[in-house]
A protein has these predicted regions:
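Glycine/proline-rich low-complexity spacer/linker segments in large multi-domain proteins
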Residues: 1-47, 400-417
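Amphipathic alpha-helical substructures
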Residues: 255-343
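Acidic/His/Gly-enriched intrinsically disordered linker/tail segments
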Residues: 202, 206-272, 290-292
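Zinc-dependent metallopeptidase catalytic helix centered on the HExxH motif
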Residues: 171-227
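Exposed aromatic-hydrophobic patches
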Residues: 79, 379-387, 474-481
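C-terminal outer-membrane/trafficking sorting elements
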Residues: 417-427, 431-496
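Hydrophobic helix-coil surface modules that form long, contiguous segments used
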Residues: 22-26, 35-182, 211
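Beta-strand-rich binding/interaction modules
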Residues: 329, 333-395, 448-454
Length: 496
């Protein structure tokens, strides 16, 4: 059976006092209340009635409809949730909390109560950061659209687990850092307003919440802080953001893929689309008639992005969500005999090629210029035309909009030994009769007639291909294997 979650319904203690709390994501709601436990099938409303001894306080989703003293020193709490809600976002927490309130004034002047329920012994340490929540809502409302549950509340309630959980309208908190607060608040839009339709697409929750942290970082620290945030949340390893088998919490809540790389996808989309189109897309995604207060897949989000930007993003989503790894760029440049600046960009990775716009920054005599080139193959040259200067430096993606590695191969700043002759994987592979082989020979090598020898798996010579090399650019040639036996072949690139 599926692992249901992180404990579901918990009878706990804090400072020796009984403490009940729930955490149902991903599949734990079924453990403690009868429900159709599917994130795409939201309940249209919910009432939760809790009777418990005083001075315990019961906290749950939505608005407190009534609080009634009962015989025997007990209290009845009736919470009412009237926005659609996924089962895993339903929450009960009880403890004799200290409570304080604040207020957020919405974009149209409506007031939203902010309620904070904290352990008495934690009050002093959490108060300052919790009180920043109002400003965070203001920032997110401006970027994402209005807080989605204005008719009810937002707040925090402490519970007995580390980290946090974005229960609808009331985040359960096991910490109090600004970034945890921003993360769980961001989920109110991305996870609660629009919920991933299945946990295959959990990045639509967690990657977006990670991105929300970066937006708060940008607000308090500016552009450099935003860039540094992403530098500190990189992931270069294997695995796809799309969760192939969402059966366990470790598969679903992969911090590197669902969170960090998922957040990077949004950061890169921002770079590809530009701020106006990107944030317009987020607002449209959160207000879409079919997705708001409902659920979405990666394809749904892609369609909104394409509609708002006018871009074809099929390759972007295929390579970053369903593909693995990242591009490894090698940049070289030269001044031609005609005084033209030629920039060459290789993708040197052994896996998929990435199609991305790349910013190039040219620095000369204290002056800088930035241009954007479209890059989608193993080797591409860009002729920038006649120049009357020699660049002091040329930088690829200087503002770090792409998850990548960069190697600089320019003759002016690299040793000749660091130039790489590269042969890329043949494609298609497997193939029927013909396959294409691409290679790159930097112009520092005097090889004008490279040869590719082809051997079978036993090392027997099978065929030879040769062609003229072109200075500072990649070459592609086709091997026609008609009549050759099926099997595995080895390619050997030689430069005379």
């Amino acid at each position: 059976p599926l692992a249901t979650g992180f404990g579901s319904f918990n009878f706990d203690e804090h400072e020796g006092i009984p403490h009940v709390w729930t955490l149902s994501e991903p599949y734990g709601a079924r453990d403690w209340w009868p429900c159709k436990d599917d994130p795409s099938d939201k309940a249209d409303s919910l009432d939760i009635v809790i009777i418990l001894p005083s001075p315990q306080i019961a906290v749950s989703n939505g608005k407190l409809k009534e609080q009634i003293d009962m015989p025997g020193g007990k209290i009845k709490y009736h919470w009412s949730e009237r926005y659609p809600i996924s089962t895993y976002l339903v929450s009960i927490t009880t403890y004799p909390y200290i409570k304080w309130v604040d207020e957020y004034i919405g974009l149209n002047g409506d007031a939203l109560p902010l309620e904070y329920y904290v352990y008495p012994d934690h009050y002093n340490q959490v108060y300052e950061n919790y009180s920043k929540t109002k400003e965070m809502i203001e920032v997110f409302a401006e970027k994402f659209g209005e807080y989605p549950f204005m008719g009810e509340k937002y707040g925090h309630v402490e519970f007995g687990r580390g980290g946090g959980m974005e229960h609808q309208t009331i985040s359960s908190m096991g910490g109090y850092s600004e970034w945890l607060i921003a993360h769980e608040l961001g989920h109110q839009w991305w996870g609660n307003l629009v919920t991933c339709e299945s946990f295959h697409h959990i990045w639509l929750n967690e990657g977006f919440a990670r991105f929300s942290e970066a937006i708060w970082e940008e607000h308090i620290g500016g552009q450099n802080a935003y860039i540094n945030y992403w530098n500190n949340h990189t992931y270069y390893g294997s695995g796809t953001i799309y969760v192939e088998e969402p059966n366990t919490t470790s598969q679903i809540f992969n911090g590197n893929l669902s969170y960090n790389k998922g957040g990077w996808v949004l950061h890169m989309l921002r770079g590809v689309m530009g701020d106006d189109a990107f944030f317009s897309t987020l607002k449209s995604y959160g207000s879409n008639d079919s997705l708001a207060y409902a659920s979405a897949s990666t394809e749904d989000f892609k369609l909104v992005c394409e509609s708002q930007s006018g871009l074809n993003l099929e390759n972007f989503f295929q390579q970053w969500i369903y593909g693995e790894y990242y591009p490894k760029y090698a940049l070289s440049w030269d001044i031609s005999e005609n005084q033209e600046l030629i920039i060459s960009i290789q993708q040197t990775q052994a896996w998929q090629y990435f199609e991305m716009p790349i910013d190039i920054k040219i620095i000369s005599a204290g002056q800088t210029s930035v241009l954007t080139v479209e890059n989608d193959g193993p080797v591409q040259d860009y002729n920038l035309g006649h120049v009357d200067f020699v660049p002091d430096n040329i930088l690829l993606d200087p503002n770090n909009w792409i998850l990548k590695e960069v190697e600089y191969l320019s003759l002016d700043n690299m040793n000749a030994s660091e130039f790489k002759i590269t042969m890329h994987p043949a494609y298609p592979n497997p193939f029927n009769s013909k396959t294409t082989i691409e290679y790159f020979i930097p112009d520092i090598n005097d090889a004008t007639k490279p040869i590719i020898n082809i051997y079978d798996i036993n090392g027997n010579f099978v065929d030879k291909i040769s062609t003229l090399g072109n200075r500072n650019e990649g070459n592609a040639l086709t091997w026609d294997a008609t009549g050759k036996a099926s099997g595995t072949y080895i390619l050997n690139l030689l430069t005379p």
